[in-house]
A protein has these predicted regions:
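Surface-exposed patches in mature extracellular/periplasmic domains of secreted proteins
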Residues: 26-40, 53-63, 102-118
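Short, surface-exposed glycine/acidic/tryptophan-bearing loops
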Residues: 40-89, 105
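Hydrophobic side chains within well-formed alpha-helices
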Residues: 12, 16, 34, 38, ...
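A short alpha-helix/helix-coil micro-patch that ends at or immediately precedes a cysteine
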Residues: 3-51
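Disulfide-stabilized extracellular recognition modules
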Residues: 82-132
Length: 132
């Protein structure tokens, strides 16, 4: 389908995770483990933010409901979203230069990460989901 064709290569998404873990390491935090169910939820959210750029889903529910729908159990969760950046390094740099996004990346409560990116009409939309 055209939607799945828009999902970015796993290498771009893997690079987001690698750079995120590098930033955590430089600041004294443990690396996050990539979680398949979180990544599935991130892919759902990437398509949603292309329609409505918000932490609230198009249905009106919180972003965290996408985690539950993908079978993720958690006590604490966070979401970083972005649009327009052309590469993994560009988006992680943007997040690290934004206090709220940086706080998610450097949150010691989180142990798992899921990431996704989708290309809609030439614009890249990026999502990171975090869970404890």
């Amino acid at each position: 389908s055209s939607v799945s064709a828009g999902i970015r290569s796993s290498s771009a998404v893997s690079e987001v995770v690698r750079l995120t873990n590098s930033a955590r390491g430089q600041n004294g935090y443990a690396a996050l483990v990539e979680d398949g169910a979180l990544s599935e939820a991130a892919a759902v959210r990437a398509r949603e933010i292309a329609r409505s750029f918000s932490h609230t889903r198009p249905s009106g529910a919180s972003f965290s409901s996408a985690l539950s729908e993908s079978g993720v159990t958690y006590l604490r969760a966070g979401e970083n979203i972005a649009s327009g950046q052309k590469s993994a390094s560009e988006v992680v740099n943007a997040w690290m230069n934004s206090p709220g996004h940086r706080a998610n990346i450097l949150n010691s409560s989180y142990s798992r990460i899921g990431s996704a990116s989708v290309n809609i009409d030439g614009t890249l939309y990026w999502v990171q989901l975090f869970a404890d």
